[in-house]
Regions:
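Beta1/beta-strand and adjacent pyrophosphate-binding region of the FAD-binding site
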Residues: 4-20, 40
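Conserved N-terminal helical subregion
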Residues: 8, 84-186, 194-199
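Conserved Rossmann-like nucleotide-cofactor binding loop
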Residues: 20, 47, 180
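Glycine-rich FAD pyrophosphate-binding loop
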Residues: 29-58
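N-terminal FAD cofactor-binding segment of flavoenzymes
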Residues: 54-96
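Conserved FAD-binding catalytic core of PHBH/FMO-like flavoproteins
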Residues: 72, 162-166, 172-275, 280-282
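FAD/FMN-dependent oxidoreductases across multiple families
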Residues: 251-338, 342-343
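C-terminal helical "tail/cap" subdomain of flavin- and related membrane-associated enzymes
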Residues: 330-411
């Protein structure tokens, strides 16, 4: 629920009410049941949960794994999204200009869908509506954290809310305010960053032919190009485009109009879905692998892009963050049941230990694919050609890759 003035103390303060922060709060609220816990969410941007406007053509989209669907179902959010998502029944992976195409389908994996694509605006509406309806979660918005300091109790936050300045103590602060977190910078938490010298161009596109719930991942000399299935709107066959470009290409393409950009995209993607008829508003941003050197401190935990920001090649960023979210909620509920302080370091280290392997494996998996499929080095060209053939011939290997993509891998 929205509040105009915060209390002086909260058991938990979440900085950032976006997809990760809001999902964490919704999951925690459900897990708490009748257990009392004071929660404050600080969000810089005013929510628009009650807007009657539907998701526009230009809304960006997110790929959700099958595992993320199960998580959102478990916290009662999937039901509100179900009519706004497009299921992925098959994934086709190919290397542009070379033989070898791998098809991974839902029947082979024995699941209803390999994943889903949801438009960010709709996901935001559902999450914001839940926060506003909650009787346990206090939402201060728009508000900014102006200062942060460790105390014996946990953390002391200075807040700017409209024309008002105030402060709040918290046993635990969960940072979920994105990859360029000003709070992280204030605390001196460093990031390990590897820049890929690539940019992603993201847009929604209109296609001549229906996608038939197939997602396409096409590897090119400048990096991967993905087209994910979206729901029909006004009878238009739509897809979500993630196009990896060199720095030079990104500088050129971001200034191009639709007429100039369409033939370039068509040449790169091909005609599997016929002609590309329209490109919506484009978003261009640099790509890197960024990992926080500290994910926890006494009274502090990091979630989402502030903890780890991945290349979008495998669509693992939000899905990993939701697995982190589930783990942190479990650890905090367990601590509450044992009457331990939420911000105690031994509690937070349980969370780190639980997610360390998943985070390391997922980030390395994404990084390796990025390096392998963005290179024209002959050895890597041969290796990825061999890899695609191996995936085509070996169902067990294909199943392992699919399980990782679906967020169901145990390793």
């Amino acid at each position: 629920m929205q509040i105009s003035k915060p209390d002086n103390f909260y058991d938990l303060v979440v900085v950032g009410g976006g997809m990760v922060g809001a999902s964490f709060c919704c999951a925690l609220e459900q897990a708490l049941g009748e257990t009392p816990l004071s929660i404050l969410v600080i969000e810089a941007i005013s929510p628009n949960a009650n807007s009657a406007k539907q998701s526009s053509f230009d809304a960006r989209s997110t790929a959700l794994s099958f595992g993320s669907r199960k998580f959102l179902e478990g916290i009662g959010l999937w039901q509100a999204l179900d009519d706004a998502v497009s299921a992925i029944h098959e994934i086709q992976v190919s290397d542009r200009g070379r033989l070898g195409c791998v098809e991974i389908n839902r029947d082979e994996q024995g699941v209803e869908a390999l994943g889903y694509v949801v438009e960010n605006k709709r996901l935001g509406q559902v999450l914001n509506a839940r926060l506003n309806e909650s009787g346990k979660i206090n939402l201060l918005c728009p508000a900014l954290v102006s200062s942060v300091k460790a105390t014996e109790k946990g953390m002391l936050l200075g807040l700017n809310h409209g024309d008002t300045e105030t402060s709040v103590d918290a046993s635990l602060v969960v940072l979920a305010d994105g990859g360029k977190s000003p709070v992280c910078e204030q605390l001196g938490i460093e990031q390990s960053i590897e820049r890929y010298d690539q940019h992603a161009l993201i847009a929604n596109i209109v296609l001549e032919k229906p996608h038939q719930h197939v997602a396409f991942e096409r590897f090119t000399d400048t990096g991967p190009l993905a087209v994910l299935p979206l729901q029909l709107i006004d009878g238009k066959n739509r897809g979500s485009l993630v196009w990896t470009l060199s720095v030079e290409q990104a500088a050129q393409y971001r200034e191009m109009n639709e007429e100039k950009l369409l033939p370039l995209l068509q040449e790169r993607f091909g005609y599997k879905l016929g002609k590309i008829l329209e490109i919506g508003q484009t978003f261009v941003y640099p790509l890197s692998l960024s990992i926080a050197k500290e994910q926890v401190r006494p009274g502090l935990a990091l979630l989402g892009n502030v903890a780890h920001s991945l290349h979008p090649v495998a669509g693992q960023g939000l899905n990993l963050a939701l697995r982190d979210t589930r783990a942190l909620v479990d650890v905090l509920i367990n601590a509450k049941q044992r009457d331990l302080g939420l911000g105690e370091m031994n509690v937070l280290l349980e969370y780190v230990a639980r997610q360390q392997a998943d985070q390391a494996t997922t980030t390395q998996f994404t990084h390796n694919i990025t390096k392998l499929f963005s290179s024209n080095n002959e050895a890597k060209v041969w290796l990825r050609k061999f890899g695609l053939v191996a995936l085509e011939l070996l169902p067990t290997l294909r199943r392992s890759l699919a399980e990782r993509a679906m967020g169901l891998s145990k390793s």
